[in-house]
Amino acid sequence: MENDYLEPIPDDCIICLNISKTYNRRDPDDIRLDLYDCVRKYWVMDINRAKTANRVLAVADGVIIAEYEPESWGHIEHKGRRRCYFEGKEIVPSAYIGKRVTYRGQNPVKYINM
């Protein structure tokens, strides 16, 4: 039986971002209207650490639904707080889509190979 859990490629430095709340909710007051905007904006993280990632994986309900190659990182104000965001391109096809990711605790950001 094939393992359906994420097994990272050794050279990939990965950030997994749990977007279950924003992606599934589709709050009409939220400006994130598509998958890319759900995953790229408003993260609390160390931007210097984030800049070392060569892959960003969007995770909803424990399953990877998209993979991106970040091209740049920056800060943005959101609801009065400074948050990180990235600009990048989607990777299609992806070896990671459909794989499961487990999170411990409540942090929606998970670093792998970093």
Predicted regions: what is each one?
Residues E69, K79-G80, I97-R100:
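Short conserved micro-motifs at the rims of enzyme active sites and ligand-binding pockets
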Residues L17, Y68, E87-I91:
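Short beta-strand element of the conserved SAM-dependent methyltransferase core
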Residues K51-R55, C84-F86:
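Acidic, aromatic-enriched beta-alpha/helix-loop junctions
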Residues L57-V59, G80:
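Positively charged, phosphate-engaging catalytic surfaces used for nucleic-acid and nucleotide handling
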Residues I65-H75:
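Short beta-strand-centered aromatic/proline hotspots
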Residues H75-E90:
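Short, solvent-exposed secondary-structure boundary/capping segments
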Residues M1-A53, A60-G62, P93-A95, R100-M114:
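Compositionally biased, charged N-terminal/linker segments
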